[in-house]
Amino acid sequence: MTDRVALVTGAARGQGAAIVSRLRADGFGVAACDLRIDELNACVDALDDTGVIAVPLDVASADQWSTAVNTVVDRLGSLTTLVNNAGVLHRASLAEETPAGFERSWRVNCLGPFLGIRAVLDHLRRADGAAIVNTCSTGAIRPFPNHAAYGSSKWALRGLTQIAAAELAPSGIRVNAVFPGPIETPMLDEATQARLVAASVSGRLGKPVEVADAVSFLVSDHAAFITGAELVVDGGQCLRIG
């Protein structure tokens, strides 16, 4: 058992897997949560660490959130930290976007974090150093054409982060957000990665561990007086968008 226990969503690969590894290195017990059960189990098994557990979770299901939180507390002893990292991305023009595609983006990218915050509140209110980090996007800082579903859902998550930070500060719960730019993850296909590198101020994509480092800081005691913050991890991408 450890004093600090984090629940991380979207943890089967990419950024989420990097966040799990980094928080474990920081001394957290970590519940790695994802819909991709086989990938999740393989990722956690590879760590060979009893301080990391795999927990199936569809972030758009309130019932699954309740079950996941109970599992985490039963197996790891407490819950002090939530990282809402799960997300989906697809490109479509306004004319080509579908109601189903739009709704799926909102259910995963915004409803999911809301359900997560609600599910962990009782535990975080009892915790010392309680913290929540939401994974937003540079798409919630600048408007990206052909990203109506993704972009609008991340703008909403940005707003939810601010509201939660204001509401939960009196309870000692800090709520912050990271805003990754182009990161080398399975979410981006090779053609998209090449296009983003060509347009990058930094001449490269970010690495998942660089986002994980930002999350690590925001949930740590070094950020004890920081809430409602928006930490951009984009290699200068937003400097080139206007």
Question: PLM features: residue spans?
Answer:
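Active-site helix of classical SDR
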Residues: 117, 153, 161
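Short, small/polar-rich loop/turn modules that mediate ligand/substrate recognition or access, typified
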Residues: 169, 174, 226-228
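Canonical Rossmann dinucleotide-binding motif of NAD(H)/NADP(H)-dependent dehydrogenases/reductases
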Residues: 2-30
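Short C-terminal tail/terminal secondary-structure segment
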Residues: 142, 216, 227-242
